[in-house]
């Protein structure tokens, strides 16, 4: 088989960048999507210096036209896409916190719409746009970056570690993304495309903060593993470091 082609949104920093590094061992050519062109160029230079075969797509997930542009980019250059990592996303305010931005009863409607637009609607739109190319792959893989905070089962359990860690807009957007994972995996069950959700863990990133217990190298392992699943690997699941999580 020819070299795997991967696309990682938000790949210019944090978990996206680290996932690109992890895919080096899979022999993939990794194209990172970056809203900031200069940051993207610097990230590609670092990836190449580390031995990754890397490319850059100037990409803003919140712009509808960029989904079609991404399709055109991969179709014209490679005719297929093997790996899509839907990594780009935003939080709602500083987390953990107790402000109205975290409250189900008080979160401003414009903030709720903004978080859902980025973390859910834009992910769905991009995946739909690229799906014809993923179906052309002999082993298409879609990884949706979710969070343990998407788990309704754990949020409802007073004994769970996240029972008191609630940020409504962010959590609900990731729960919706998990629903997309389940439904799309079912639709693609008779194809060679696998779809899974990944919880990276609480990682030292711009979103996770310096107090997070996990390093980037560990946080990217779940995404990288799901992006390179064998043919008999799972689909329609929610995982952290190889272990299934409750929905």
Segments the model singles out, each with a brief description of its role:
Residues 37, 58-70:
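The beta1-alpha1 cofactor-binding region of Rossmann-like NAD(H)/NADP(H)-dependent oxidoreductases
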Residues 175, 190, 197-198, 205, ...:
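C-terminal helical subdomain
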Residues 26-42:
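Conserved glycine-rich Rossmann-like NAD(P)H-binding loop of the short-chain dehydrogenase/reductase
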Residues 50-52, 73-86, 92, 108:
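A glycine-rich helix->loop->beta "capping" turn
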Residues 85, 126-130, 134, 180-181:
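Hydrophobic positions on the long internal alpha-helix
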Residues 2-31:
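Canonical Rossmann dinucleotide-binding motif of NAD(H)/NADP(H)-dependent dehydrogenases/reductases
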Residues 8-9, 86-87, 141-147, 194-199:
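Structural signature of the Rossmann-like NAD(P)-dependent dehydrogenase/reductase core
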Residues 90-116, 121, 135-189:
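Catalytic loop of short-chain dehydrogenase/reductase
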């Amino acid at each position: 088989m020819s070299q795997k082609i991967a696309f990682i949104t938000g790949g210019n920093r944090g978990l996206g960048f680290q996932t690109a590094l992890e895919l080096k061992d899979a022999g993939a050519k990794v194209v990172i999507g970056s809203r900031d062109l200069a940051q993207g160029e610097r990230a590609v230079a670092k990836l190449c210096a580390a031995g990754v075969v890397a490319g850059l797509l100037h990409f803003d997930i919140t712009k509808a036209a960029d989904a079609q542009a991404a399709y055109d980019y991969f179709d014209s250059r490679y005719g297929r896409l093997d790996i899509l990592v839907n990594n780009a996303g935003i939080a709602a305010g500083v987390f953990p916190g107790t402000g109205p931005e975290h409250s189900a009863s008080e979160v401003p409607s414009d903030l709720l719409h903004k978080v859902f637009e980025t973390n859910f609607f834009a992910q769905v739109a991009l995946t739909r746009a690229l799906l014809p190319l993923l179906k052309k792959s002999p082993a298409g893989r879609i990884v949706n970056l979710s969070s343990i905070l998407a788990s309704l089962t754990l949020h409802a359990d007073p004994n769970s570690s996240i029972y008191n860690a609630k940020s409504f807009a962010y959590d609900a957007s990731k729960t919706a993304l998990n629903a997309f994972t389940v439904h799309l995996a079912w639709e693609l069950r008779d194809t060679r495309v696998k779809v899974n959700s990944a919880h990276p863990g609480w990682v030292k990133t711009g979103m996770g903060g310096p107090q997070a217990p996990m390093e980037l190298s560990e946080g990217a392992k779940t995404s990288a593993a799901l992006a390179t699943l064998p043919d008999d690997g799972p689909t329609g699941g929610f995982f952290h470091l190889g272990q299934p999580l409750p929905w």
